Amino acid sequence: MKEMNICGINKNWVLPEAQENNVKKFLPRPLSRVNGWSPPLHSFQAISWITYLAMSIVTFGIFIPFLPYSWKYAANIVMGGVFIFHLIVHLIAITIDPADTNVRLKKDYTQPVPAFDRSKHTHVIQNQYCHLCEVTASKKAKHCSACNKCVSGFDHHCKWLNNCVGRRNYWFFFWSVASAAVGILGVMIILCYICIQYFVNPDELRTDPLYKEIISENTWLLFLSLWPVPVKTPIVLSIAVMALLLAIASFVMLGHLLIFHLYLITKNMSTFDYLMKTRFKKNLHPAEEKELPLQKKGDLPQEKSDNWAWPKSPPRVGSQKFPVSTLSPKSSVCFVASPPKICHSED
């Protein structure tokens, strides 16, 4: 029989907080991630690579060979250049370590990061010193909770790259998005031309010499340049429709993301600045919001004495004039799609 006290409470009952603290003591301390190739890899990486591979196969293996003979060379050169450029900048954006200079010079990525103790420190970074990385960080650096390190010129944590985007790889990220949008737009133009020509003048899609041996107009050749595969019209149309729908969905997301970053560039803001400024405005009264001056990049009320991308402790009464973030301990600024939002790093 359970032993109870006078209030009817089990004496062996443990407070949830104490239970949680006991569990945390036995959990291994996390390591910092070097770049987008560091485990754990993210499922969004697989989606992006599968999409890139699928678009490459259908574009160069199926649809460009349908174009008029004189257009094929131009299409292969232009689309090939865009796809190769995207691959290069995408790989660079993933591979670069965006950590702050002092972190890269001092940090041993094989060693676990110390746990943050709020009883000793109010914030992760104070007076430009990071208590987790144990280095003096640059002014615009933030400590990313997903990568568990200070990132120079922190913009956001990108799940598609599985890497933080900061000062060292921001422009590679930007050109990766821009080249992907241009490439997808090119695929959409080619697909629209093929669909229109199929109903208007299908002979324009059968200019390759190999079609002279094909008697049936309901038979089409895929992968003409490598290994011609004869298929019926419904198969070609099904592939074209699926590719077009995928291209449209990708272009909407990429276009939105590209426009958003063009806006940030014109305003000289980072994604992190934008999110914090938006959150700050939501917590203001209408009268106070009208009086809020236009702020420059990195000059936000929340960052007046602290640079962070880590959850802050609740403000003490009378010591904090501005609202602070209520991010959970495993949250970071991430891109799932555009616009950006606060999301859990383990999602």
Swiss-Prot record:
- Keyword set includes Protein transport: no
The record's keywords, sorted A to Z, are: Acyltransferase, Endosome, Lipoprotein, Membrane, Palmitate, Transferase, Transmembrane, Transmembrane helix
Q: Which InterPro entries match?
A: Palmitoyltrfase_DHHC, PFA4/ZDH16/20/ERF2-like
Superkingdom of this protein's organism: Eukaryota
Segments forming domain DHHC: 128-178
Q: Does the keyword Membrane apply?
A: yes
Q: Which residues lie on this side of the membrane: Cytoplasmic?
A: 1-46, 97-170, 256-347
What terms describe the molecular function in GO for this protein?
A: protein-cysteine S-palmitoyltransferase activity
Alphabetically, which GO biological process terms does the record hold? antiviral innate immune response; peptidyl-L-cysteine S-palmitoylation; positive regulation of defense response to virus by host
- Record: active site: 158
Topology relative to the membrane: Multi-pass membrane protein
| Effect of gene knockout | Homozygous knockout mice are viable and do not show overt phenotype. Composition and number of major immune cells is normal but mice are more susceptible to DNA-virus infection and death than their wild-type counterpart.
**Residue numbers spanned by region Disordered:** 291-332
Q: Tell me the Pfam families matching this sequence.
A: DHHC
Any single Gene Ontology cellular-component annotation: endosome membrane
User: Which catalysed reactions does the entry list for this protein?
Assistant: L-cysteinyl-[protein] + hexadecanoyl-CoA = S-hexadecanoyl-L-cysteinyl-[protein] + CoA
Topology: which residues are Lumenal? 68-75, 192-234
Sequence ranges of Basic and acidic residues compositional bias: 291-306
Regions of compositional bias (Polar residues) in chain numbering? 322-331
- Similarity-based family: Belongs to the DHHC palmitoyltransferase family.
What quaternary arrangement does the UniProt entry report?
Interacts with IRF3 and STING1; in presence of DNA viruses recruits IRF3 to STING1 promoting IRF3 phosphorylation and activation.
Describe the function of this protein.
Endoplasmic reticulum-localized palmitoyltransferase that could catalyze the addition of palmitate onto various protein substrates and be involved in a variety of cellular processes. Has a palmitoyltransferase activity toward NCDN and regulates NCDN association with endosome membranes through this palmitoylation. May play a role in cell proliferation.
User: What is the recorded name of this protein?
Assistant: Palmitoyltransferase ZDHHC11
Q: Which organism is it from?
A: Mus musculus
